[in-house]
């Protein structure tokens, strides 16, 4: 079958999204939100830099490297959840685990990106409701507390 490049790209994206949804379930939606947040942060940062005549290819490149590092951290979080699940299931340790590290990490990064987007919007001259930034900070603290709580429980059990 000879598909044109646009159809081939659509088919590949559809297959990728279907595979992720099949593999990750509801976490695929969270992953998609994170990817969108990263893109919006990069775009809003670019717009803010251009508006303020401060755009620099080196800074843009550093931003992309930062995003690449975030992707690696999220992959480590997903692998961590996978290993904990497999060990609990396969070694008969009686651990019932559906994953905590991956969604918490994604949520933390989504809120961090949202905060960065708001900072970029301020640089664009947009007024931000103070309660919105407060909600983001409170939510980040809650995610940190949940992550720390889970880590503390693991340390205590050893």
Predicted regions and their residues:
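Membrane-proximal cytosolic segments adjacent to transmembrane helices
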Residues: 1-9, 111, 115-158
């Amino acid at each position: 079958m000879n598909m044109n490049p646009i159809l081939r790209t659509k088919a590949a994206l559809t297959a990728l999204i279907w595979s992720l949804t099949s593999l990750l379930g509801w976490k695929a939606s969270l992953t998609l939100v994170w990817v969108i947040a990263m893109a919006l942060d990069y775009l809003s940062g670019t717009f803010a830099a251009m508006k303020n005549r401060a755009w620099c290819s080196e800074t843009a490149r550093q931003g992309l490297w930062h995003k690449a590092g975030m992707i690696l951290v999220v992959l480590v979080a997903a692998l961590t959840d996978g290993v904990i699940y497999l060990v609990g299931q396969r070694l008969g340790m009686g651990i019932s685990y559906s994953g905590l590290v991956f969604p918490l990490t994604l949520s933390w990064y989504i809120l961090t990106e949202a905060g960065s987007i708001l900072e970029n919007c301020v640089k664009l001259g947009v007024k931000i409701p103070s309660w919105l930034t407060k909600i983001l900070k409170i939510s980040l603290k809650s995610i940190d507390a949940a992550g720390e709580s889970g880590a503390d429980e693991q340390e205590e059990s050893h």
